[in-house]
Amino acid sequence: MKLRKILLAVAGLALMLNASAQKSKRYYVAKPGTLVELMTEAEANEITQLTLQGKLNAVDFRHLRDEFKNLQLLDISNASISMYAGKNGTYPNRFYVYPANCIPAYAFCKQMDDSTFVGKETLTRIILSDKTKNIEDAAFKGCKNLKI
């Protein structure tokens, strides 16, 4: 009987530790390209579940890919994706025109120095908006743990 109580206590403690490790945040992005202005890099790296509302663009997706080191779940169901043209988006090392309401090319896939591509392996789930028209080239390439 004592062993059973000890095992239950250990299991309960493990569940509590796992639950406390999850960090969920919700942000409203008023202007496309300004997501990172809403938090510090340390705060971004702690987030495991992120809900975004408002307006995003390819610059925001680059930050989601490169700076949210523990991001597992991303909910953008109540966000719109604005058109962006420039070199600061997700496409590696070139000027690119990112259409509105499309998941940008290479959104969660980064080109490394040796020209290989690495996906965001922490990402397990993404909830898209009904307004999403298209998923551009290699947006989720290499995201091995992403479930549909």
Per-range role (PLM):
Residues 67-70, 110:
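Structured segments of extracytoplasmic/periplasmic soluble domains
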Residues 1-24:
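Bacterial Sec-dependent N-terminal signal peptides
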Residues 106-107, 136-141:
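Consensus positions within tandem repeat domains that build extended binding/scaffold surfaces
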Residues 34-43, 59-66, 137-139:
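Short, T/G/N/S-enriched strand-turn elements that build extracellular solenoid repeat scaffolds
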Residues 23-31, 48-56, 71-86, 90-102, ...:
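Structural signature of tandem-repeat unit edges
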